[in-house]
A protein has these predicted regions:
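Residues that scaffold, gate, or flank divalent-cation-dependent active/transport sites
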Residues: 1-104, 108, 113-115, 242, ...
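Short acidic, glycine/serine/threonine-rich loops at helix termini
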Residues: 10-15, 113-115, 160-167, 232, ...
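DNA-contacting surface of Y-family translesion DNA polymerases
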Residues: 19-20, 204-348
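Generic non-transmembrane alpha-helical segments
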Residues: 36, 85-94, 136-145, 207, ...
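Short Gly/Ser/Thr- and Asp/Glu-enriched loop/turn motifs at secondary-structure junctions
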Residues: 101-106, 153-157, 297-301, 348
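Catalytic palm subdomain of template-directed nucleic-acid polymerases
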Residues: 108-138, 212
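Long, highly charged, low-complexity intrinsically disordered interaction regions
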Residues: 132-195
């Protein structure tokens, strides 16, 4: 949580048990919680505002969980440092060309060229060898960083490895899972929620629903021509993915044309107070500044985009300005707020 000392502190990430106990999404505010983050006491004000129970049994339940909840500040510089350590571990098992960092906490490694070197036993299948080498990588990560890692594996392509990671590996005793083409009908098609599928968000799910598609199995068996006509190349690509087909390659990752560096958030509810919106912008500017300093770069252009709720009859805010090269947090924050103040009137 960023700025936990403030009632408007921003929840940037939450554990599954936190979401289940407190009924919250991954992102929110301290005042969205049914307890005070400082005292860990039940907040009757917040509870009533959200229509929650206030009976003694529920109060005890919330306070008991609040006492054992760890609230920690975001440390992007630390995350980047540990990420670099893990990338170094990957290079013990594959060349830099075989490694593709996907995000701050995920990455792909193609073990095709090194698999038989690390696991030379000829009697073992490729699937068994991949599992053994993945276990070695997990152990190395734990010994060097103290982090328990989860591994999605595939004999086929990066897509199935990612789906195995998101939908099975996190639930297995070994924290590993291997999905191949043979698993598509049984595992890929049975993914319970469409939004649990790589590349499908709430908006895309709604568009699929209007076409009568309500599951990954429905998508896999839909007419690809109709999907392309209604949703463009994105619809066709997801149809291929639903059938386990992925032509992406770790050795030739997508290289964006833009050299920009940014941060984005989809807020869990409407924000009406200008002060709350400014807090979000400040925190995002701070994270971008940290990342700029980490890679030794400076910004020369600052831009912001803010979208309104669907029921607000207002155009989104899109604006930018040229600045003197800087990676200073205070300066970048001031530029962001200046752009915001120049365009914002009111709304959520």
């Amino acid at each position: 949580m960023s700025r936990a000392d403030n009632s408007a502190g921003l929840i940037l990430a939450s554990s599954p048990i936190f979401k289940k106990v407190f009924g919250k999404s991954n992102v929110g505010r301290a005042y969205d919680l049914p307890f005070d983050v400082q005292t860990r006491k039940f907040s009757y004000y917040n509870a009533k505002k959200q229509g929650l129970r206030t009976d003694p049994e529920y109060v005890r339940f919330i306070e008991d969980w609040a006492k054992v909840t760890f609230i920690v500040p975001p440390r992007m510089d630390k995350y980047i440092s540990v990420n670099m350590e893990i990338q170094g571990i990957f290079q013990n098992y594959g060349s830099p060309n075989d490694i593709y960092p996907y995000s701050i906490d995920e990455g792909f490694i193609d073990l095709s060229s090194s698999l038989n070197y690390f696991v030379p036993e000829k009697q073992l299948s490729r699937k068994q060898k991949l599992d053994l080498i993945s276990a070695k990588i997990q152990r190395d990560i734990w010994r060097q960083t103290g982090i328990y890692s989860t591994v999605g594996i595939s004999n086929a392509n990066p897509l199935l490895a990612k789906l195995a990671l998101d939908n099975e590996a996190k639930k297995t005793p070994t924290m590993r899972a291997n999905w191949s083409y043979e698993d598509v009908e049984q595992k890929v098609w049975s993914i319970p929620n469409m939004t649990d599928f790589w590349g499908i968000g709430k908006r895309m799910e709604k568009r699929f629903n209007t076409l009568g598609i309500h599951s990954i199995k429905d998508l896999a068996n839909a007419n690809p021509d109709i999907l392309k006509k209604e949703l463009g190349v994105a619809g066709l690509r997801l149809w291929f993915h639903a059938n386990g087909i992925d032509e992406s390659n770790v050795h030739k990752p997508y290289k964006p044309k833009s050299k920009g560096l940014g941060n984005s958030q989809v807020l869990p509810r409407d924000y009406f107070r200008q002060r709350d919106i400014e807090i979000v912008l400040r925190e995002m500017a701070e994270q971008v500044a940290i990342r700029l300093r980490k890679i030794g770069k400076k910004a020369t252009v600052v831009s912001i985009h803010l979208g309104y709720s669907n029921h607000e009859n207002k155009r989104s805010i899109n604006t930018q300005m040229k600045i003197e090269p800087t990676n200073n947090t205070d300066l970048l924050t001031n530029y962001v707020l200046k752009l915001f103040h120049n365009k914002y009137t009111s709304g959520a």
